[in-house]
């Protein structure tokens, strides 16, 4: 039998695995999207803290203007938050400065370098919408963004990690896309 068997990976979020038919496919590429303030980042953190451990590390890239420290302070209010995992099996990387220059290839290289050095089983990119807005207003245009998305998708699937893109969308935009 030459078929590769990919298992279902429970999310660790009460009730979510039932909705997903048992969990997420291992090494899957996932999108967490919704309107502002709907809990996308909190859901991502709940999954990350439930699954991350010594044998499955997590890398959380943030491209938001706020520093990871501010986000960590907010997430600490939840019972799933475990400060002992931060640094050892969960690492935060702020890409805001890389993105500010508008150089998508530089952002890709930074992401790849961090993934290669930390070898995570889980990768999160929050917020993907910030990358799109940079394409619309910066030096690089929509075709550069499309190349970035394709290249990021290709690299993410080759990392043998379950990956998540987190995107903020207004309801009208979500329906249009």
Where are these regions (language model features)?
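Conserved ATPase "switch" residues in P-loop NTPase domains
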Residues: 24, 52, 153-157
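Conserved P-loop
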Residues: 30, 35-99
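Short boundary/hinge segments that flank catalytic cores
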Residues: 5-7
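Pre-Walker A adenine-sensing motif
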Residues: 11-23
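P-loop NTPase motor core
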Residues: 30, 100-177
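Charged, amphipathic alpha-helical linker segments immediately N-terminal to NTP-binding catalytic cores
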Residues: 1-3
